[in-house]
Amino acid sequence: MRQKRAKNYRKLMHTYQLLFGFREPYQVLVDADFLKDLSQQKIDIQAALARTVQGAIKPMITQCCIRQLYSKSDELKQEIRIAKSFERRRCGHIDEALSPSECIQSVVNINGRNKHRYVVATQDPELRQALRSVPGVPLIYMKRSVVILEPASRATLLEKHNKESVQMGMSKEEKLLLSGKKRSANELAIDDQDTKESTDLAGTEDSAPKANKKRKGPKGPNPLSIKKRSSKNHTTDEPTLPVNIIGDVGERKKHRRKRK
């Protein structure tokens, strides 16, 4: 799957999570035709569905769809084996089996709502058209060996707009209740108090005068790179003697003794 398409699918499923409460693993209702087409193309159904919804899945199939596969058991042995690995969704049509499209529609569309948060994978265009009128129903089908997730339907977009409009005028407590996060009044009061204290503290810090930073002057040269000064000969205060006198210092002057 291309990166751009995967990103769009991930974003779309995130919308279903926020607005309609979808959670992983997603419950994917698969009809008999979708199962048969993917099996003939030798496509791993569970892996393909997981890539499409960008998350873990729980594949499911209704009893009516199983009956349709068993009606052609000689031709669809591989499909029946795959269907047995799916979770069986009890539709309640025991006495009289319905067509797969009617069965899936009765399971998904409960009073105009997708109560059980099903993702529907079907090749029936009439079934997809009927389920587009129900808000919050992700629809999957295969076209040219590519499994496709339909964009959000008009009913889903309208429901999204209505919920966003309602949330704009809600208080903090009402938004938490709508999102399913129940918190006590004491916790909300503590949060409000913490917010107020942090705001006051920020205002106090802004009003306090800021101490001027001491500007650093130009740095001196590196002492290791300076050439050492040459030591000068220190002069003594002792007077210098002439050369002819220096040699006579310490020597006794010899006198001849005069004899009488």
Swiss-Prot record:
<feature type="region of interest" description="Disordered">
    <location>
        <begin position="188"/>
        <end position="260"/>
    </location>
</feature>
<dbReference type="GO" id="GO:0070181">
    <property type="term" value="F:small ribosomal subunit rRNA binding"/>
</dbReference>
<dbReference type="GO" id="GO:0032040">
    <property type="term" value="C:small-subunit processome"/>
</dbReference>
<comment type="similarity">
    <text>Belongs to the UTP23/FCF1 family. UTP23 subfamily.</text>
</comment>
<comment type="function">
    <text>Involved in rRNA-processing and ribosome biogenesis.</text>
</comment>
<keyword id="KW-0539">Nucleus</keyword>
<protein>
    <recommendedName>
        <fullName>rRNA-processing protein utp23</fullName>
    </recommendedName>
</protein>
<keyword id="KW-0690">Ribosome biogenesis</keyword>
<keyword id="KW-0698">rRNA processing</keyword>
<dbReference type="GO" id="GO:0004540">
    <property type="term" value="F:RNA nuclease activity"/>
</dbReference>
<dbReference type="InterPro" id="IPR006984">
    <property type="entry name" value="Fcf1/Utp23"/>
</dbReference>
<dbReference type="GO" id="GO:0005730">
    <property type="term" value="C:nucleolus"/>
</dbReference>
<dbReference type="InterPro" id="IPR029060">
    <property type="entry name" value="PIN-like_dom_sf"/>
</dbReference>
<dbReference type="GO" id="GO:0006364">
    <property type="term" value="P:rRNA processing"/>
</dbReference>
<dbReference type="Pfam" id="PF24779">
    <property type="entry name" value="UTP23_sensor"/>
</dbReference>
<dbReference type="Pfam" id="PF04900">
    <property type="entry name" value="Fcf1"/>
</dbReference>
<dbReference type="InterPro" id="IPR002716">
    <property type="entry name" value="PIN_dom"/>
</dbReference>
<feature type="domain" description="PINc">
    <location>
        <begin position="26"/>
        <end position="129"/>
    </location>
</feature>
